[in-house]
Amino acid sequence: LEIKKAKNTIVQDRTIYEDAYIFAPNLHAMGLMSTRDFENYFTLFKLMSSLVEPPDLLLYLRASVPTLVNQIQKRGREYESSIRLDYLKRLNERYEAWIESYKLGRLLILEADYYDFPENKEHLSEVIDKINAELHGLF
């Protein structure tokens, strides 16, 4: 809700939609969230989503499982070291289904298997240009 009041550009790493359409359903499907808890969660999500506006632009970085594994290894976070490949695959499938049905606003899909932002400044510049073009129609 604070984002609505902001006068400057806000960039978020995650949206409320991802938890509701990807992570929570995945936990429910894995048997790690009860049906009652999932239904309660989704009811709360619907209330929250009615109070916030969708982003001006949703940037989706589409990545293959090998790219995801590579990024996880680069980060070196201990708690991520035991993430299973089948879990990543299920999340990827849920992301793809969600993105395919996303109709709340503008969407920019970038192939993360191609881009290497931290190492390649030209890639970062290209991505920034694409974002600016979507937001402002400048390019």
Locations of regions flagged by a protein language model:
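Short secondary-structure boundary/capping segments
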Residues: 2, 8, 49-50, 99-100
